[in-house]
Amino acid sequence: MAKDVIIACDFSSAKDTFDFLDKFQDEKPFVKIGMELFYAEGPEIVRELKRMGHKIFLDLKIHDIPNTAKKTMSVLSGLDIDMTNVHAAGTVNMMKAALEGLTRPDGTRPLLIAVTQLTSTDEETMKKDLLIDKTMEVVVTHYAMNAERAGLDGVVCSPKEASYVHDLCGDSFLTVTPGVRFADGDTGDQKRVMTPAEAAKNGSDYIVVGRPITEAADPVAAYRRCVREFLNQGESNG
């Protein structure tokens, strides 16, 4: 299965996004568009990035009643995105409805993945704030099995849980993993993190990397380093 690095373009405007991507010239990295940018610029930012040749992960984390999730995904399916997501906590029925809404009349659709637990969450937070008295591994894999049962393509989890997900759901079930930082970088507000090489060795199919690339002195060099470490599993010292 092909692996890739997805750049989290967590900018507040189209201008900032285009200025950043212009640094890559003819390279067309896979990009993630999140709530901040999508809510600021609307669907046109997605259309323009597709015209520019980028693959897009639209990260809106839909979590609503099944009917609303279905109708929302029906709208998103018209944007020619490559991947989008829902919250696994929305239940199996919601995920099934979202998948149905995302599927176009010709049977094609973007990849649909489910968010398990955000990488800013740890077990203490789950217990105190969410009243979930289980280990992170148990919670994430339970959500992953629900997503598989609903027919989804994979889950968002930390790279620390990727191997557990593959053990239960198979190698073809995708693990899309934020919480990736360089060994010499700052972890920021992330609590469950690995390096690109560690993520690859633990089974991540896609890694989502934001600030270590977007805030780097040389974003292109940082991106290439990330790709090299992820695809070569750390064999290159860059």
In which residue ranges do the predicted regions lie?
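Structural motif
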Residues: 26, 52, 79, 150, ...
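N-terminal amphipathic alpha-helix/helix-capping segment at the start of soluble metabolic enzymes
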Residues: 1-20, 163-170, 187, 194, ...
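Hydrophobic faces of well-ordered beta-strands that scaffold small-molecule active sites
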Residues: 3-9, 31-33, 56-60, 84-86, ...
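Active-site-adjacent beta->alpha loops and helix N-cap segments on the catalytic face
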Residues: 14-16, 36-52, 64-71, 88-111, ...
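Short, acidic/polar
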Residues: 12-24, 67-75, 136-146, 191-198
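Glycine-rich phosphate-binding active-site loops on the catalytic face of alpha/beta enzymes
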Residues: 79-91, 189-222
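Conserved anion-binding
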Residues: 2, 68-72, 77-153, 158-161, ...
